[in-house]
From Swiss-Prot:
Disulfide bonds: none annotated. Its main location: cytoplasm. It comes from Drosophila mojavensis (Fruit fly). This is Diacylglycerol kinase eta. GO terms for cellular component: cytoplasm; plasma membrane. Residues 1167-1187 have a biased composition (Low complexity). It catalyses: a 1,2-diacyl-sn-glycerol + ATP = a 1,2-diacyl-sn-glycero-3-phosphate + ADP + H(+). It is found in: Cytoplasm. GO terms for biological process: glycerolipid metabolic process; phospholipase C-activating G protein-coupled receptor signaling pathway. Residues 82-175 form the PH domain. Phosphorylates diacylglycerol (DAG) to generate phosphatidic acid (PA).
Length: 1925
């Protein structure tokens, strides 16, 4: 019964009724053959072959032959792997016109469907001769129809994307199998295949099938039409249509290619037969062509020309392409797709500006599909892309090789932003110009660019394309929305809510599942496959169980979860089938079988030791034996594709479940849960040569799922310096698929970096062989932990590490789950807090068992270990950990810094050794590649993970020393047995939340902290004295404590911190702590606690100085050197450690004034040395030696490594220098040499050798233009090839690498010391070796703040600013004023911002300085800012205006990119926070919930009004001014009571509102708003009433400012709605900065150019008509050349011309003879004209042939000169000339006739170079000639006789009387000018002259044969114009 086809059924034994039915079916479905079958009863079938009912369960019994049913129960396990696609669709039932939900399963060549997936019997449809097409014309219900010879089904999908996916799957199922290739080429198959794209449609006139040539059935000719070439077919004939759709590339042209002799290709015509439009006219014979009776005549798909069958041979072979020639990419120019996925293009000759079109098929009242089809018809189909299907990247990649092209985005503002973002990604700003066609709702950008508010009609698309071709270019500013999100407090909830705190959990599960799916498809490693399969099952089970638990009443969600389980089971079936036969007995099949056998998979959850609230552990992974087996699995192509389809199916099901779990907030998932649009998995291309020998214990390509993916958090509690994004190593084979999280030592203390993953590194050994090093970052910050929870040191692991003693199980990973939250902060608390809490609890139990002697012994052993640099076994119990250990570590005694094992080698690059050097130390004078990574953007992963740990002895030791080498982040308070633990986050957060980050930065950066230890020198000497040791004893001791303790000692140096001591060493936070402690007697008696601040360097987020590491003192006091030479002699012993922390020394130009503070302290005397640079000199003095002593201990970091006590120790305290500029702004100048000398001088004063040029070579990848020698560059490249410590960064994330909230604590290059005088040339050099910086040249607000908060500032009096010399207010420091002259933000030099390489803008030219603040902001009714109740706020209340209203920004706009922010999105139009964003967010949610209610632009406007009215009542954004802070260019703006803030880049907001208002007043202080001036407009929104009124009223009182950068601080713990270009989301608390990103070329409408082009084209058309011959109705007459013979009509005009010239010559001669006083030159001109006239008719006979036209040129020239001279003479002498009355009249008539005749003449230069004359057979032009602009000559004769003036009448030209005198020929000419030549014969037959023409009516025209309504209207209007003229 298989493969039944209807047209070969045996009907011999059928009844007559059955015979007729079967014969009708055969004729109708003539598409294939059927195997012979005996008597087959056939039910009734429609004529076009469609079934009257496709539901098999209700059809009559005989129809079963067409509905073959098969049982899939027995084949399920064997055949499911070959399923291409499956899912639910709505199926149309023909009987009752209903839709039923059915489950469809698509295999190759077959389609099955049943009621649900669990059915055992499916209906089978053979797809061998399939035709499928789209039924929905207007993209309404996403329906499509599939037709086979036996079946016809109409199916409906839920979305257009799903419908297109099904259509693509049907194409895959029916296409012949081909070898697996590149996914890009597979995606391009549609473009390059030339297949038709059918859709069902109806036609208003008879239409014929292009396949069978029969008429389409029905009154409306219902059938299928190709959306590209308009080929018409029956539904039954679609499968037989050949693939001859519109060409796309040269390969599709095929045999029609025409090559010229020179090798160039010609674009030929592409003809489509029949179905021509009504008004089609033959391009050859100009007669009507086409027919409604049959399929005849031809139409070109490119130039739109139509031609008769007989006339087609006479058509030119070259196709002109049509009216859009400038925009079309000819298929002959596109040769192929190159290796970089771009077209190999050969530009055609002539003008060429290709147009790339992106259409959003959902935009424009769902009319986007119509525009998509229309563009494909007008242009090359390969130029047009649907954004919904392919996105913008595909088109941009194809057009990459075009030097210049245009982009047309047909959509709303959101899609425009999408395309512009992709242009950013491809870096194609200079190649393309972007235009917008308004198809969206708001279309603000299109309004501003001049393209209107909407475009709904596609009929005038050719004319619209011409407008885009004549558009002009303007630059559009684009702004980066940089966000820094803080952790927020989530209120305790009784039950998990998916919409709030569990978003991180959902994201982690989805991400983990996606990773495992990718591993299953791509990996060839069996162990990886096993672990990924188990992890995937566990993750999916956990996800489904948790979602279903909290959505028990949602049946649809339960259905989606069931589908997910079923698809997961099918994936496992496919894996099992794949492994059967080849690996039937291995553990993979057993594992899969065990997973399938589980009926209700449940994951055992138990409390985690890290967080008792949320955690589970997957115990099933422990049961898998990780034995080695085959490294690659041989799969056939079809099996691999089936596995890929299964994985994609599971992936899509997971996305459906997650998206359905919160339907009201889909955007939030996309933006905050990082759920990107679905991307299908692709099968990787593998080569056989890439496989690894089975004997290798570690494969060459490391397994990519050794550890489960980390859980992503919904919002970053803090930006990590190395975010959890992919980092590529120098060797691309290693870190390409491994996510490297930030090491704990480099992460911020408030950051939860997630679960670290495996790190594998490669290093070349001495013998050249490759050694793999595998390291694992533990949750405890680098410590290795065993199963029992005991901590392993490297030495202990080395002793225990054998494969038999310990098995490495990489599969046990703690996974965050959602147990009921006990602590409301637990979901957002950093994981470090959980770690410390856990270790605290663990160690408190073990601490009781330790004895004091044991602790002392361990501490001594640790000191010995550090002194001898030898590994030693710790004598303590192991600490419990989370089973993330480093296997196979073997310590060799020969090298103290190398750990080796049989599998890998680990090199400790930071080990304290004098003998070992890195691999690059053989290069003299060059820093080690391994060690220089620390000062660059790289980190030594292995050294920071596997350095030797020590045995802790107390709870403080355990918490402080979680890592292996004392690298502890110092951004949080120290925790020891002397310090009480700080609850929550760092104190600096509390301070910065009150003061703001800018003030906090000032306080911190001007405070001397103990972090200076590593700032100035690597060897700081004693960082802190150990307990029970004095400072002096420590200085003389060579033994350095292993423990780092930043708290003050109890008995030495700094015994107590009070107002008399020196607490500044511990940072500003400790000042505040000390103040707080003095207020509490209890706290006074307790030892204070201190915290320190992280340091930051350019190009890195957190500097190496932030991690304190013990430095061995290799220099005793007796070998101390006083000069640079001795220092050089001492260098070899310290070369490697010295280069470890050396930073780059740079210079800046003289116009960048950047200084710092230098304090010099001499131990021998109280006088300090003096250092000068240029004109600045600073002398720092100290009063007593007692002050020096505390400073000496606190600022030991500035001591030179070779300078010790006893020789007049010189200390330089360096406040961090300005950050170097980035990019092109950093350029070597002539000042480099002087700066280098300055560096040498400063270094010699400090006793530090000068850095040579090779040591300056590495600093940051962001400053590529620094002066570095080529030799050093080569060394960089050479050594970076094998250095395992270099982790190169993704270029896309390089500029955001330095991301940390503490990064904002740096001193900016442009904020602390703003340049005021360019003559003040202060060089800057900075580094880690006490290079001197020079005193401030300009006062700073931070110094005043320091003086406010803490009077004990360790600054000399000379260093403080002189307040009386400031430019601003001279009032006291505590009085509100523009303190310190920060008026440069409103009246200063705009170009003072370093790093901004800007153009001159109108702002500078008009001397208006930004920011421009609205004066009403200063009014008293705008409330004060300081509302805080903290003690710092109280301290600053008196100075609130000074510190808040006019504060200098602490960070430059360019440098804020480095301050811990990440780019959320890019703004093109506007940014809104508050009520407007709330309305947009509500509208988006409404549209997602009910898309059918938001398909009309008018309805969308209505919804906006409804939601705005809702906000009028609810006021959800009330008191927004209390929740946000606004800064414009660094100036804090006081905010009134408002509900929103809008920042405008374009003068159009939310659908055309000019929210800024019109600036009509001349005295307006603001600049005219523009989108290309790099200026933003800031506006306040007081309510929805104001938003509505702004559409009607010009409001201006709500303006706030114009500026170039904006910062918005979101306070509190609640999310605030934010929108960018209409896309809204909820933004958590934090900071938002809007900075200029780049500029893009936009096409604006140029109406003046359009008018000019239209005028020119009209003149060209008239000119082309004037040179045509008189065309007759026959083709032979048209073949006669116009150059050879003067036509009859031209002869008639010529005779009139001769008569006019003769008459003028006659009367001019008579005038000269009658008035001898007139000049005689005019008489000579008249004689020459007469002679020329005689030459064309010698002896009374006109010349013939081409010579006549040549002779006429001379006649025309001489007669024109005669006419001009006569008019000039009469104008000049007319006032005194008295003419006879008859002479005046005759001369006037002669001149008037001559003027008319000259208008009909034209002279052209022909191809042969000769001039020929042509006569315009038309009536004279109605528009006056250019020479007629002056008054006519007869008016100039007003001084003549009165009688002549009274009797004068102007000649009749273009009046009703003139038209009344027309002959038939002139009427015919008039018709031809209106392009109505088809009625010429009718007018000639009826002898229609001018008199009859003026009286013609509508009925008369109908009698003359003018039946078209449009032609009738045109003729009647032209007659009316003649009558009026």
């Amino acid at each position: 019964m298989a493969n039944l086809k209807p047209n070969t059924l045996h009907v011999d034994n059928l009844s007559p009724r059955q015979r007729s039915l079967s014969s009708g079916l055969s004729s109708a479905c003539s598409s294939g053959s059927v195997s012979p079958v005996p008597i087959i009863p056939i039910i009734s079938i429609s004529r076009d072959g469609e079934e009257s009912e496709t539901e098999s369960e209700i059809e009559p019994e005989p129809a079963r032959i067409f509905h073959r049913r098969m049982s899939t129960h027995s084949k399920r396990n064997n055949n499911l792997s070959a399923i291409i696609r499956e899912g639910y669709l709505m199926k149309h039932t023909w009987s009752f016109q209903r839709w039923r939900r059915r489950y469809f399963r698509l295999k190759r060549s077959y389609l099955y469907y049943a009621k649900d997936a669990k059915c055992d019997v499916f209906d089978e449809i053979d797809l061998s001769e399939l035709c499928y097409f789209e039924c929905s014309i207007k993209n309404v219900n996403h329906s499509f129809q599939i037709i086979t010879p036996t079946r016809s089904l109409v199916l409906c999908a839920d979305s257009r994307r799903e419908m297109e996916d099904w259509l693509g799957s049907l194409k895959t199922a029916t296409a012949p199998q081909r070898p697996r290739g590149d996914s890009f080429l597979i995606d391009q198959h549609d473009i390059l295949s030339n297949h038709h794209h059918w859709y069902a449609t109806s036609h208003a006139r008879p239409t014929y099938c292009n396949v069978c040539r029969d008429a389409l059935s029905g009154v409306t000719s219902h059938g299928l039409s190709c959306e590209v070439c308009k080929c018409k077919v029956h539904k039954r004939c679609a499968a037989k249509a050949i693939a001859n759709c519109k060409w796309t590339t040269l390969a599709t042209v095929g045999k029609d290619i025409i090559e010229q002799p020179d090798g160039s290709l010609i674009m030929p015509h592409q003809w489509m037969e029949g179905n021509l439009p009504v008004s089609a006219v033959c391009a050859v014979c100009k007669k009507t062509c086409g027919s409604v009776l049959r399929l005849q005549d031809w139409r070109c798909l490119w130039c739109r020309d139509t031609v008769h069958v007989a006339c087609r041979p006479q058509m030119p072979i070259v196709c002109p392409i049509g009216p859009a020639k400038l925009s079309v990419v000819p298929p002959t120019s596109v040769h192929s797709i190159s290796t970089d996925d771009a077209w190999d293009v050969v530009s055609p000759k002539g003008n060429f500006s290709p147009l790339l079109v992106f259409v959003n098929s959902k935009s424009g009242d769902n009319q986007g599909v119509k525009f998509l089809r229309r563009f494909k018809q007008l242009l090359n189909p390969a130029q047009v892309f649907d954004l919904i299907s392919t996105g913008p990247s595909l088109g941009l990649r194809l057009f990459r090789h075009f030097e210049m092209f245009r982009i047309l985005v047909c959509s709303g503002d959101g899609s425009v932003g999408w395309v512009l973002s992709e242009i950013d990604r491809f870096n194609m700003h200079k190649q393309c110009q972007v235009a917008v066609m308004p198809l969206g709702t708001g279309n603000d950008l299109a309004r501003v660019l001049g393209w209107g508010s909407s475009c709904d009609d596609d009929t005038h698309l050719p004319q619209i394309l011409e407008r885009y071709e004549s558009a002009s270019t303007k630059m559009l500013d684009r702004w980066s929305i940089m966000v820094f999100e803080k952790a927020i407090t989530v209120p305790k909830m009784p039950k998990m809510s998916i919409t709030t705190e569990q978003e991180a959990l959902l994201t982690g599960m989805v991400t983990s599942a996606n990773h495992h799916l990718r591993f299953i498809v791509e990996t060839n490693d069996t162990q990886t496959l096993i672990s990924s399969t188990r992890s995937l099952c566990d993750t999916v089970d956990e996800l489904v169980s948790r979602i279903c638990e909290h959505h028990k009443d949602d049946e649809q969600l339960a259905m989606k979860c069931d589908i997910l389980r079923q698809k997961l089971t099918m994936l496992l079936d496919a894996l099992q089938e794949e492994e059967l036969g080849t690996h039937s007995g291995d553990d993979l099949v057993a594992t899969i079988r065990s997973l399938i056998s589980r009926s209700g998979p449940l994951t055992t959850a138990r409390p985690s030791f890290l967080n008792p609230n949320i955690s589970i552990e997957k115990t099933e992974k422990d049961n898998i034996n990780s034995k080695e087996r085959r490294n690659s699995r041989s799969l056939r192509s079809s099996e691999k594709e089936a596995l890929q389809c299964r994985a994609n199916s599971v992936k899509r099901a997971i996305y459906n479940v997650v998206e359905h779990s919160e339907p009201g907030r889909p955007k939030r998932y996309q933006r905050k849960l990082s759920i990107t649009p679905f991307e299908a998995l692709k099968i990787p291309i593998t080569n056989s040569g890439d496989s690894t020998p089975c004997g290798s214990p570690l494969p060459i390509i490391p397994p990519i799922n050794i550890i489960s993916p980390t859980m992503e958090t919904s919002r970053l509690t803090c930006i990590s310096p190395l975010p959890d994004t992919r980092r590529d190593s120098v060797d691309e084979n290693f870190f390409n698929s491994i996510n490297l999280p930030a090491p704990r030592q480099f992460a911020d203390s408030r950051r939860s970096s997630g679960v670290p993953e495996v790190i594998q590194e490669m290093e070349e050994g001495a013998s050249g062989e490759t050694v793999y090093r595998v390291g694992r970052l533990s949750l405890s910050g680098g410590a290795n932990i065993d199963d029992a929870g005991n901590r392993l040191s490297p030495s202990s692991e080395a002793g225990e590490n054998t494969p038999t003693e310990r098995k490495v199980d990489f599969l046990r990973v703690p996974i965050m789950t959602s147990e009921p939250i006990v602590d409301p902060l637990s979901n957002y608390r950093p994981i470090e807090v959980f770690e410390r809490t856990y270790y605290m609890a663990r160690e408190m139990d073990k601490d009781k068992e330790r004895t004091a002697s044991g602790q002392v012994e361990s501490e001594k052993e640790e000191a010995d270990v550090n002194e001898k640099s030898e590994p030693q076994e710790p004598h303590r119990a192991l600490v419990h950990t989370c089973n993330l250990q480093v296997p196979g570590i073997v310590v060799t005694p020969q090298s103290q810094n190398v750990y080796t094992s049989e599998n890998f080698t680990i090199i400790d690059t930071d080990a304290q050794t004098n003998t070992e050097q890195s691999s690059s130390e053989d290069l003299g004078g060059e820093a080690s590649d391994v060690l220089s990574a620390i000062s660059n953007e790289e980190c030594s992963v292995a050294s920071e993970i596997f350095d030797k740990p020590e045995s802790g002895h107390s709870l403080g030791d355990i918490i402080q020393n979680l890592d292996a080498n004392n690298f502890t982040h110092i951004d949080s308070p120290e925790t020891s047995d002397e310090t009480e633990p700080m609850p929550g986050e760092s104190l600096m957060d509390d301070i910065s939340s009150v003061l703001g980050h800018d003030i906090t930065n000032a306080l911190q950066d001007n405070t001397i902290t103990d972090d200076t230890t590593t700032l100035c020198s690597e060897h700081a000497g004693p960082t802190k004295p150990p307990r029970k040791k004095s400072l002096s004893a420590l200085v003389q001791s060579k033994t350095h404590p292993r423990r780092r303790n930043s708290s003050p000692p109890r008995k030495a140096g700094l015994a107590r911190m009070d107002s008399d001591d020196n607490p500044q060493q511990f940072g500003f936070e400790n000042i505040v702590f000390e103040i707080d402690n003095r207020c509490d007697d209890q706290k006074i008696r307790e030892p204070p606690r201190y915290c320190s601040l992280a340091q930051f360097v350019e190009g890195n987020d957190i500097a190496r100085q932030s991690f304190k590491q013990l430095m061995l003192d290799r220099n005793s006091g007796d070998n101390h050197n006083d000069n640079g030479k001795n220092e050089e002699a001492d260098t070899p012993t310290n070369s490697a450690p010295t280069r470890t922390y050396r930073n780059l020394t740079t210079t800046t130009t003289s116009d960048e004034l950047e200084t710092a503070i230098k304090i010099e302290i001499n131990n021998a005397t109280t006088n300090t040395t003096t250092s000068t640079s240029s004109s600045i000199s600073t002398t720092t003095t100290t009063s007593t030696t007692s002050t020096v002593k505390p400073l000496e201990s606190a600022m030991a970091s500035s001591t030179s490594p070779t300078k010790k006590s006893g020789h007049g120790q010189e200390i330089s305290v360096v406040v961090r220098p300005p950050t170097p500029l980035r990019g092109d702004s950093v350029k070597p100048t002539a000042s480099s040499a002087s700066s280098a000398s300055l560096l040498a001088t400063s270094s010699s004063l400090l006793g530090v050798r000068t850095l040579n040029s090779s040591e300056i070579r590495r600093h940051s990848s962001h400053a590529p233009s620094l002066a570095v020698r080529d030799y050093d560059k080569d060394k960089d490249r050479r050594h970076s090839g094998f250095n395992p410590n270099f982790l190169t960064l993704d270029p896309e994330h390089a500029r955001f690498l330095s991301s940390s909230p503490a990064a904002s604590r740096r001193i900016s290059c442009g904020s602390l010391f703003k340049k005021r005088n360019q003559k003040l040339n202060v060089k800057r050099t900075y580094g880690l070796f006490s290079v001197r910086f020079f005193v401030v040249a300009e006062p700073d607000i931070r110094l005043a703040t320091l003086a406010l908060i803490r009077p004990l500032i360790p600054l000399p009096n000379e260093a403080l600013p002189n307040l009386q010399t400031l430019k601003g207010s001279k009032s006291s420091l505590f009085m509100g004023s523009t303190l310190f002259g920060f008026e440069h933000f409103s009246a200063g030099d705009k170009d003072e911002k370093p790093g901004k390489d800007k153009e001159r803008t109108p702002t500078e030219e008009t001397n208006r300085k930004l920011p421009i603040i609205n004066p009403i902001v200063r009014l008293p009714n705008w409330p004060n800012l300081a509302n805080g109740t903290g003690f710092i706020s109280k301290c600053l209340m008196a100075n609130a205006d000074t510190l808040c209203a006019a504060v200098s920004p602490l960070m430059d706009p360019d440098e804020t990119l480095l301050a811990g922010y990440h780019e959320k999105c890019v703004m093109n139009n506007y940014f809104g926070i508050g009520i407007d964003a709330k309305i947009s967010l509500d509208f988006h949610n409404k549209r997602e919930e009910h898309p059918e209610k938001c398909r009309s632009r008018a309805r969308n406007y209505m919804w906006y009004g409804v939601l705005g009215s809702k906000q009028l009542l609810q006021k959800t954004c009330k008191n927004l001014e209390q929740r946000v802070q606004l800064e414009c260019d660094g100036q804090r703006i006081p905010l009134p009571e408002l509900q929103g803030i809008v920042i405008l880049n374009i003068p159009s907001f939310m659908g055309g509102t000019n929210f800024w208002g019109n600036s009509s007043k001349k005295e307006d202080i603001f600049l005219p708003p523009s989108f290309d001036d790099r200026v933003l407009e800031v506006v306040a929104v007081f309510g929805s009433v104001q938003m509505a009124a702004s559409r009607l009223i010009n409001l201006q009182h709500h303006r706030i400012a114009q500026c170039q950068s904006v910062q918005i601080n979101i306070l509190g713990d609640e999310e605030i709605p934010i929108q960018v270009d209409g896309e809204a989301w909820l933004q958590p608390p934090g900071m938002i900065r809007i900075l200029h990103k780049n500029r893009v070329q936009m096409l604006c409408r140029n109406r003046s150019l359009e008018v000019s082009l239209k005028t020119w084209q009209e003149k060209q058309r008239q000119h082309s008509i004037s040179i045509q011959r008189d065309t007759s109705s026959t083709a032979s007459e048209h073949a006669v050349s116009t150059d050879e013979v003067i036509s009859e009509r031209e002869c008639y005009v010529l005779l009139n011309f001769i008569e006019a010239v003769s008459s003028l010559v006659k009367w001019v001669k008579f005038l000269i003879i009658s008035h001898p006083a007139l000049q005689h030159d005019l008489y000579e001109v008249a004689c020459r004209a007469s002679e020329a006239l005689e030459s064309i008719h010698p002896q009374g006979k006109l010349l013939e042939g081409p010579s006549l036209r040549t002779k006429l040129v001379e006649v025309i020239d001489s007669s024109r000169q005669l006419y001009d001279d006569a008019c000039t003479l009469l104008r000049d002498r007319g006032h005194s000339l008295i003419l006879r009355e008859d002479l005046e009249t005759k001369l006037s008539a002669a001149l008037a006739n001559m003027e008319m005749e000259l208008k009909k003449c034209s002279v052209q230069k022909c191809i042969d170079g000769k001039l020929r004359a042509y006569f315009n057979v038309l009536a004279p032009n109605e528009e006056p000639d250019g020479r007629r602009k002056s008054r006519p000559f007869w008016v100039r004769l007003r001084s003549g006789s009165t009688a002549g003036q009274q009797q004068f009448k102007p000649p009749i030209t273009n009046t009703r009387e003139a038209a009344n005198n027309w002959s038939v020929n002139e009427v015919v000419t008039w018709l031809e000018t209106m392009q109505l030549s088809e009625y010429v014969d009718s007018f000639l037959k009826n002898d229609i002259r001018g008199k009859e023409l003026l009286t013609l009516g509508r009925r008369d025209l109908k009698d003359l044969g003018v039946v078209k309504v449009g032609h009738v209207k045109r003729i009647l209007q032209a007659i009316k114009d003649l009558s009026e003229n």
